[in-house]
């Protein structure tokens, strides 16, 4: 024991020398003065300063911290008492924590092996569970009424570094057998809390469960973090015997006894930007086709859906979050939903977001509950205490949550995410726990229509089957349809076949994103930012000429670009952009009020106005601008109009109308007669509004679907079951931008009759 005391004294002198010499020009002495002035009881020592003073001492502190924690605490306490004798009461001491680089002792919960037991480690992860803060008795004081004496007893468990562990027997009688009365007011306690820390989702091994480590925090470290926080905890890794099994069975549970907890920002895993990277980003942002370039670079294995890919790019960039002085929180994250027929690559788009976004968590509607997405109150298996456990949306704070099969979720569970999508917090009031957790994440959901496939004769709201209170929280809602077009089907089949034939030079299959990941492993600053042309991957783009060949960014550079634009660019609205947003919002409201065809996919509310602002800000981020211009608002409105009003049909109709007008003008200039379309032509020689050919029976599939949708919406809106062909012709030509001829109307109605959707007799159409 004397040798132990001598060693402790030597270690204490070593730390006193460190504080006296104070590498860093008085940093630690000033820190001790601030600690005394602010009534704090913990001093953080930097490992770099300790290494500069005594390299051997720093190594021994990391390898055998149990021998040095108490001497370090005694040394700091002595210095504090010299500065202010009244700072510490009798028996009190200043605690010591460590920070700085730990070399290979900086690990994740997955890397904690048995070789680290008994050493000091720095573990980084995300807090998933927090127990309640409980008092732990340090010294009990008892009074004997017979003798009038006081008796005190100290308690130390195996987690303590000061002295040896003591027994937990609570005294009820003194040595003479006299009864003792506990003086609770004179007893001393310390706060105690247990945390569960899990490895961060983006760094966890694919296909494996994330590892978790229990952390014990005491005194001033309690309540310094909450579920969902990313932390770096420095502590001693120890093995403790279980309460039920003990040390006889040889089964121990391991815990991390913390001495310092540091909150990490969300940029802990940020990529490193070189000067060449910044130069290339500026060049990309100055291009006129930056939006199309990023959209085409996202998930090149998915054919088409360019507008949806553009929206996903804006979603990952996000707007600017605002916290006003009056406490109002304006979210900057963008929420998006895709509803459509099966096999239109909705789930594949979600997987693409998982690969590109810096932080993304994936879940499904049927496999998720409301508490699993938000937060839950659970019971500790050993102590029975209540603890707060974070859900998927809390863990994805500052990230993206991908929810597939959104329509399969129960209504009760779906209501739980209403607060997250607008207020971006999770409020829990259960089992005596009332807490509010941050869930500042974007939500991208995919769902199937209520009838399995999308019915064009019904309004979008009836197809989706979700309440308006939830739909209005989505900034964008895309209707993804499986259109039967022979030309498009041919292109999709060729694209899918090329994906399956995409192989390496040696004949083995390889990842579609091989180029991107190869660039990630290459640390060359001059690495190419564009994916090299590959016939199997890019098809026959080169045959169409270099100008039409679509450039695609590598995965590595796309990640860097999105991360840089999202976190380092904070645009602000200009007066011109604000006026244009207000005018556009008024036009959208007016258009939705006068819509006779059932409106668009989303209700136009005040949330739509905020959506325009967020989308415009995201587009300004993409262009690396610090101001939102009118052009950004125009680009945002294009995406919003596409999502709400299916602009793909309108653009096609406008194109066909222009072609028809050009044909009519050419025939008029040539002196042709009978070139006007009066709706009663039947010769088949008149110029018609078709994609290919010139006869009335060659009507495009999109025009047929648009006709059926207009007819179905008119029937539902007016509650009628029959109309004359003349009335139908007038109605569709009044609602459509490109008119239909009489022969086209009759041709489409005959197709609907063959499909048993209508019945035609004597010029009257009865809706079945």
From Swiss-Prot:
Q: Give the family this protein belongs to, as stated in its UniProt record.
A: Belongs to the MCM family.
Q: Which organism is it from?
A: Zea mays
Question: Which GO MF term does the entry hold, naming one?
Answer: ATP binding
Q: Which CDD domains match?
A: MCM3
Gene symbol here is ROA1
Biological process (GO) annotations held by this record are: DNA strand elongation involved in DNA replication; double-strand break repair via break-induced replication; mitotic DNA replication initiation
Q: Where does it reside? A: Nucleus
Per the record, what are the reactions this protein catalyses?
Answer: ATP + H2O = ADP + phosphate + H(+)
Signal peptide per UniProt: none
Residue ranges annotated for the MCM domain, each copy included: 290-497
Protein name as catalogued: DNA replication licensing factor MCM3 homolog 1
Say which enzyme class the record assigns. hydrolase
What Gene3D superfamilies does the annotation carry? Answer: 2.20.28.10, mini-chromosome maintenance (MCM) complex, chain A, domain 1, Nucleic acid-binding proteins, P-loop containing nucleotide triphosphate hydrolases
Q: Which SMART domains match?
A: AAA (SM00382), MCM (SM00350)
Comp. bias regions, Gly residues: 672-682
> What does the entry list under GO cellular component?
MCM complex; nucleus
Superkingdom in the source lineage: Eukaryota
Write the Enzyme Commission number(s) for this entry: 3.6.4.12
Question: Which UniProt keyword terms apply here?
Answer: ATP-binding, Cell cycle, DNA replication, DNA-binding, Helicase, Hydrolase, Nucleotide-binding, Nucleus
């Amino acid at each position: 024991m004397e040798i132990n005391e001598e060693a402790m004294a030597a270690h204490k002198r070593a730390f006193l020398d460190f504080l006296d010499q104070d590498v860093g020009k008085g940093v630690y002495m000033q820190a001790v003065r601030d600690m005394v002035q602010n009534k704090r009881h913990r001093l953080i020592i930097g490992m770099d300063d300790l290494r500069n003073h005594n390299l051997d001492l720093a190594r021994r502190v990391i390898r055998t911290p149990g021998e040095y924690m108490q001497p370090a605490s005694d040394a700091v306490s002595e210095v504090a008492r010299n500065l202010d004798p009244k700072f510490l009461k009798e028996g009190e001491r200043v605690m010591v924590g460590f920070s700085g680089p730990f070399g290979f002792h900086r690990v994740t919960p997955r890397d904690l092996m048995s070789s680290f037991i008994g050493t000091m480690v720095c573990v980084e992860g995300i807090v998933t569970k927090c127990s309640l803060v409980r008092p732990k008795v340090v010294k009990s004081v008892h009074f004997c009424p017979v003798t009038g004496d006081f008796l005190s007893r100290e308690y130390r468990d195996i987690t303590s570094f000061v002295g040896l562990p003591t027994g937990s027997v609570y005294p009820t009688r003194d040595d003479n057998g006299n009864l003792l009365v506990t003086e609770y007011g004179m007893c001393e306690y310390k706060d105690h809390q247990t945390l569960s820390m899990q490895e961060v989702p983006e760094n966890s091994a694919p296909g494996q469960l994330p590892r978790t480590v229990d952390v014990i925090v005491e005194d001033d470290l309690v309540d310094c973090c909450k579920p969902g926080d990313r932390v770096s905890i420095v502590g001693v890794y120890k093995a403790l015997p279980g309460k039920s099994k003990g040390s006889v069975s040889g089964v121990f549970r391991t815990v991390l006894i913390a001495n310092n907890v540091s909150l990490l920002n969300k940029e802990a895993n940020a990529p490193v930007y070189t000067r060449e990277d910044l130069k290339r980003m500026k060049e990309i942002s100055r291009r006129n086709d930056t939006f199309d370039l990023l959209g085409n670079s996202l998930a090149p294995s998915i054919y088409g859906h360019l507008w949806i890919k553009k929206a996903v790019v804006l979603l990952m960039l996000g707007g600017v979050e605002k916290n006003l002085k009056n406490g109002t929180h304006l979210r900057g994250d963008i929420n998006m939903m895709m509803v459509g027929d099966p096999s239109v690559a909705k789930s594949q788009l979600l997987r693409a977001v998982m690969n590109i976004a810096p932080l993304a968590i994936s879940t499904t509607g049927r496999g998720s509950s409301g508490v699993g997405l938000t937060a839950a109150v659970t019971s500790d298996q050993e102590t029975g205490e209540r603890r707060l456990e974070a859900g998927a949306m809390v863990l994805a704070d500052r990230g993206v949550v991908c929810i597939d099969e959104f329509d399969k979720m129960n209504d009760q569970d779906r209501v739980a995410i209403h607060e997250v999508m607008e207020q971006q917090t999770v409020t829990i009031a259960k089992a005596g726990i009332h807490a509010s957790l941050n869930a500042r994440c974007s939500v991208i959901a995919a769902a199937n229509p209520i009838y399995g496939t999308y019915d064009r004769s019904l309004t979008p709201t009836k197809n989706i089957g979700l309440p308006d209170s939830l739909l209005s929280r989505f900034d964008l809602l895309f209707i993804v349809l499986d259109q039967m077009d022979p030309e498009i089907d041919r292109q999709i089949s060729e694209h899918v076949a090329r994906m399956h034939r995409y192989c390496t030079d040696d004949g083995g299959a390889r990842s579609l994103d091989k180029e991107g990941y190869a660039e990630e492993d290459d640390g060359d600053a001059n690495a190419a930012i564009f994916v090299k042309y590959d016939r199997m991957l890019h098809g026959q783009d080169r045959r169409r000429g270099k100008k039409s060949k679509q450039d695609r960014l590598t995965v590595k550079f796309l990640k860097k670009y999105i991360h840089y634009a999202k976190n380092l660019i904070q645009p602000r609205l200009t007066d011109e952009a604000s006026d244009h947003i207000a005018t556009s919002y008024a036009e959208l409201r007016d258009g939705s009020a006068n819509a006779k065809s059932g409106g668009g996919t989303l209700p136009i509310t005040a949330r739509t106005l905020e959506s325009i602002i967020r989308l415009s800000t995201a587009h300004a981020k993409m262009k690396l601008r610090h101001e939102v211009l009118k052009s950004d608002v125009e680009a945002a409105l294009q995406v919003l109009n596409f999502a709400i009003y299916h602009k793909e049909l309108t653009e096609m109709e406008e194109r066909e109308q222009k072609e028809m007008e050009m044909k009519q003008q050419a025939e008029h200039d040539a002196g042709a007669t009978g070139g006007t379309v009066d709706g009663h032509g039947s010769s088949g020689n008149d110029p018609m509004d078709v994609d290919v050919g010139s006869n009335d029976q060659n009507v495009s599939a999109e025009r047929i679907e648009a006709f059926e949708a207009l007819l179905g919406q008119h029937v539902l809106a007016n509650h009628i079951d029959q109309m004359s062909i003349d009335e139908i012709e007038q109605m569709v030509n009044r609602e459509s931008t490109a008119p239909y001829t009489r022969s086209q109307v009759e041709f489409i109605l005959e197709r609907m009759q063959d499909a048993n959707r209508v019945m035609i007799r004597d010029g009257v159409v009865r809706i079945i």
